[in-house]
């Protein structure tokens, strides 16, 4: 029988395993050979544990060039040149260095590299909502250009919150991004947080929802012309009282679309009725539905609706159907943005198409050009504004005349 004095008291994993085996021996009568076997087992477990600890340490602790050099018995400069495939380093040394680097999961220290080069080859992107179909197409365009040019992309979303936007822009700045692409939230009316970053020399290119700063470039669509064309189409279809579901009043895109709507009415000498302009600050389906219910409750309801976006237009169509009215016979509807569901609605929604992918590409090209100009000595940055054309897609929701 084994005595308690023979049991290890340590709480390490390998000692605990041995305790289990040693205690098991108390239940049975084993000879001295078992005791020797148990202690041998403990020794093996100790060795395995040490190896596991080393592997875990090397896996989760940042491996450096010095670690590789120490293991191979060569200088850190030789390791550095081998990793860069320098011609002065022998193929055998390169092979050994790269094999060990892969085994130890070596990754270059991006922070140290960026401090030496004053560049991270990283672009920060801030959007209001990633679930927004238009913004998802913009992101695709940004990544298409950025990755081709050797830049990584860090994406942040404000969720339409000014406070989140402030947090995001600060986090991207602290991450030492080379520049930022940004579309402001609907809550953003004060731009001090943006001006603070611009004053530090970080290039920012705005897209879609923009801040009119002389220090920054922007890529937008012609919201005015797109809205005017959609409203003119409703007029051509015979609409006499056209309502407008207005977007967030602080956003330039909302103002431009409202002006396009008004200009189309003025061109046809049609009066602008304030009661036919209803605010939808969030631009949601629910807001569009509620706004349309109010419009249909008017003594003289509209026979056409131009919505600031497609979700609100979808809500308008729901309200019209629930009222027992026909689209477009009783009320014609047109939206803006050409969301993916627009063509699937019943009837399919007439809408203004925004080239989101192209906008993302142009914004990324502009920013990369600014970054590279900034890297050149005495290069003076000049702000640019790129305006992309919209396209009216006519579908059944607005075709009163067939």
Go through the PLM ranges and name each one.
Residues 20-23, 28-119:
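N-terminal helix-turn-helix DNA-binding module of bacterial transcription factors
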Residues 49, 293-402:
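Flexible loop/turn connectors
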Residues 58-64, 102-140, 148-151, 159-160, ...:
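N-terminal helix-turn-helix/winged-helix DNA-binding helices
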Residues 71, 76-81, 116-131, 233, ...:
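Short beta-strand segments enriched in small/hydrophobic residues
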Residues 128-137, 155-164, 184-186, 209, ...:
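Hinge/beta->alpha junction and helix N-cap segments in small-molecule ligand-binding domains
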Residues 163-176, 287-301:
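Short, well-structured alpha-helical segments in soluble
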Residues 166-182, 188-225:
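Short beta-strand-centered segments that line the small-molecule binding cleft or hinge
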């Amino acid at each position: 029988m084994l005595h308690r004095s023979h049991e290890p008291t340590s709480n390490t994993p390998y000692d605990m395993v041995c305790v289990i085996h040693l205690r098991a021996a108390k239940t049975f009568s084993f000879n001295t050979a078992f005791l020797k076997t148990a202690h041998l087992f403990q020794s093996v477990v100790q060795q395995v544990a040490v190896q596991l600890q080393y592997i875990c340490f090397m896996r989760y602790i940042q491996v450096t060039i010095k670690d590789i050099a120490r293991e191979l018995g060569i200088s850190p400069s030789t390791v550095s040149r081998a990793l860069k495939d320098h011609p002065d380093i022998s193929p055998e040394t390169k092979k050994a260095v790269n094999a060990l680097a892969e085994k130890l999961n070596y990754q270059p220290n991006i922070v140290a590299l960026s401090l030496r080069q004053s560049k991270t080859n990283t672009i920060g992107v801030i959007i209001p909502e990633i679930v927004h179909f238009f913004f998802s197409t913009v992101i695709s365009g940004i990544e298409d250009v950025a990755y081709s040019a050797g830049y990584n992309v860090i994406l942040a979303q404000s969720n339409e919150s000014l406070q989140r936007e402030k947090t995001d822009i600060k986090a991207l700045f602290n991450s030492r991004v080379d520049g930022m692409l940004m579309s402001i939230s609907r809550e953003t009316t004060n731009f001090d947080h943006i001006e603070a970053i611009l004053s530090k020399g970080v290039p920012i290119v705005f897209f879609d929802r923009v801040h009119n700063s002389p220090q920054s470039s922007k890529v937008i669509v012609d919201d005015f012309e797109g809205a005017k064309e959609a409203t003119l189409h409703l007029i051509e279809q015979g609409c006499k009282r056209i309502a407008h579901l207005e977007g967030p009043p602080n956003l330039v895109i909302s103002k431009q679309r409202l002006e396009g709507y008004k200009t189309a009415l003025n061109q046809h000498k049609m009066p602008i009725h304030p009661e036919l302009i209803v605010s939808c600050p969030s631009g949601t389906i629910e807001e569009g539905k509620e706004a349309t219910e109010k419009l249909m409750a008017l003594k003289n309801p509209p026979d056409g609706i131009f919505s600031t976006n497609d979700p609100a237009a979808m809500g308008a169509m729901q309200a019209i159907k629930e009222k027992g009215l026909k689209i477009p016979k009783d009320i014609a509807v047109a939206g803006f943005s050409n969301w993916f569901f627009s063509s699937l609605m019943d009837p399919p929604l007439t809408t203004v198409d925004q080239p989101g992918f192209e906008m993302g590409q142009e914004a990324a090209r502009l920013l990369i050009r600014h970054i590279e100009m900034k890297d050149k000595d005495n290069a003076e940055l000049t702000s640019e504004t790129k305006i992309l054309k919209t396209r009216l897609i006519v579908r059944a929701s607005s075709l009163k005349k067939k």
